[in-house]
Amino acid sequence: MILETINSPADVKCLSEEQTATLCRELRCFLVEQVSRTGGHLASNLGVVELTVAIHRVFDTATDRLVLDVGHQCYVHKALTGRRELFDTLRQFGGLSGFPKPYESVHDAFMAGHASDSVSVALGMARARTLLGQDYHVVAVIGDGALGGGLSFEGLNDAGGSGEPLVVILNDNGMSIDRNVGGLSKQLSKMRTDPEYYEFKKRYRKALEKLPAGPTLYEWSHEVKTALKKTLLPPVSTVFEDMGFAYMGPVDGHDVQRLTAVLQAAKEAGRPVLVHVHTVKGSGYDYALREPEKFHGVGPFDPATGKVRQAGKETFSHVFGETLRQLAREDRRVCAITAAMADGTGLTDFAREFPRRFFDVGIAEGHGVAMAGGMAKQGLIPVFAVYDSFLQRGYDMLVQDMALEKLHVVLAVDRCGIVGADGETHHGCLDYLSQIPGMTVLAPASFAELRQMLRRAVLEMDGPVAVRYPRGGEDGYDGDCGDESVTVLCQGTDAAIVTYGILTQQALRAAALLAGEGVSARVVKLNRVAPLDSDGICRALDGVKRIVAAEDQLRAGAVGERLSALLLEQGAGTEKLVLRSVGTTLPSQGSTVELRHALGLDAEGIAQAVREVLA
């Protein structure tokens, strides 16, 4: 196999046209085989095989800077840069990350995980190169979905006018950008992606400049050319050229030789260039072609049938979606908003049943929050379902366009806490919502509590409300005490464990472990984590002087620190308080079980914290 001989990008550059085509076929087989075992982002990687190979044929990623937007399409890049043999550990604890990580390889220029930032990052690198007098090329790869994020246009607007040599590759796999129409347009696009065309342009301008009326002739011909482009080329081309980019494309993203030639021309252009590439998500694997969304992020599956090996388990996301549908039937003011994550957040069925009350704003969380504020202001009840780590992108709007006016917007915040295999960029471990004035934050620990809390948040409460819940399903606790702000689940006199959300079951198990050692541990569950119920917490902790606060959040500003301040202010007489949290840095990837154990947030870790507080 040719793939087995590829240990660095230098090996890719040496291949013949036939060998390169074979390599692409082998890479697709490799991707399907490996991801079927570990799970991961398959469809997007199948779509960029030829593009990634072409990038490595033209650029040297050991010195050049390759910035991948979102980053989940990095598998081919990793396979070609000396990490092929690590794929058995893909997205596993201590293994190969599913996203670019500079600590993994010199070929990973920048950590990625969220959308729309690649052009801004690439421009920063290009400007640093110029100011420091360095010599390297900068390439950003961004998808048409990420292009819908406002940050991408901020970056494009600045980059196009900067004059900095850099290449932006627009990976258009969603057909959301206007297509070129007609034979003449196709021929013109073909000409514009030919390196000889750009060499001719340089010679043409130099020749005209030698004539007495040369500058005038050049300006006239430039105006004629611009008018023709606007008539014959897809409108998207003129958008980028108006920003200051040289536009090359559209290019067949599965033609390695054509891609190589175009990228070489872009590399030599000496100015901002946008290369528009058409790819097909899931290319080369029929099941992913038919259901690209299913195979966007997929668990282990049978490659022969495309069936996921473990499917059908009920999740918090599913329960949220079903509950919101019921609430929408009861109240016509209820609307649902998502940011390009309808399936992931459990809103697919809602969209089918209530198409006029469902709004997918694309990868634009800030816009989603601000729009929800406008809807609430006019009397609707908007529910914005969004992943915790993605909602961070709309923080300013949470304050300015929602909280300051005390608007009744409900945030259904999915993937809170430790999320597992996607690692640092996807954990929901920043307790930023509790810092927002007037925000109520609820934390269900079971499906029953999610149903009850969501109903209260939508139909009974006022002002901004966030309901935070984890990825996946229940952890063994299936109680329903969500109507109280604080609940004592287990009585004890020696120490108290204060926790909330998905860690509730771990706290109960810890209390059981300690009981076997003769230690009486009280378990206090917080259902409302912001604002904290001072009186309720003090009553729940009455008589206990040693306390452990356990939460799957970064320590700074989270419940543990706020609980500590509350007890001090109330003069509760606490003798010792141990904060058991994620700590000060976001953890890498791994299963939830593995990460909890490593962080001391499983039953044994919490029990050990109680032993320490009693020592």
Task: Locate predicted features.
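A glycine-rich helix N-cap at a beta->alpha junction
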Residues: 86-96, 161-175, 196, 403-415
